């Protein structure tokens, strides 16, 4: 999630609510018991067939971080691509724009573990 620092500081409650919903959705999608519902949703929303949805689902299982903390490497990759069109983006120090305090708060409070546990997934 990318938001201006001003928004994060003034409306952190909105950012926190969004991140909670994203984590709960991710936990739902990753739970084996919900696989058929997720496959159906992928087929409908991405307008793909069952094999394509299955491939996407398997990619999700393998590729997504269970605790989606911001990634410095990921941000640098995005920055590298964007600076081709907007060179000034290359001047930004990626490590200065990442702010994981709300994710840290959600993790420290046990929210992330509880969201996964509600879907039958243990992160321990």
Regions found by a protein language model. Give the residues of each.
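Conserved C-terminal helix/tail region of periplasmic/extracytoplasmic solute-binding proteins
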Residues: 83-124
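Secondary-structure end/capping motifs
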Residues: 9-92
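Short glycine- and hydrophobic/aromatic-rich loop-to-beta-strand nucleating segment
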Residues: 1-2, 7-8
């Amino acid at each position: 999630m990318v938001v201006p620092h001003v928004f994060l500081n003034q409306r952190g409650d909105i950012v926190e609510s969004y991140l909670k919903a994203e984590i709960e959705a991710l936990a739902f999608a990753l739970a084996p018991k919900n696989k058929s519902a997720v496959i159906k949703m992928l087929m409908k929303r991405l307008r793909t067939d069952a094999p394509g949805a299955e491939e996407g689902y398997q990619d999700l299982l393998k590729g997504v971080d269970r605790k989606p903390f911001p990634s410095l490497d990921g941000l640098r990759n995005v920055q590298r691509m964007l600076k081709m069109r907007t060179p000034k983006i290359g001047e930004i120090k990626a490590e200065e724009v990442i702010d994981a305090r709300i994710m840290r708060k959600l993790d420290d409070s046990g929210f992330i573990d509880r969201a996964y546990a509600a879907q039958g997934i243990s992160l321990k």
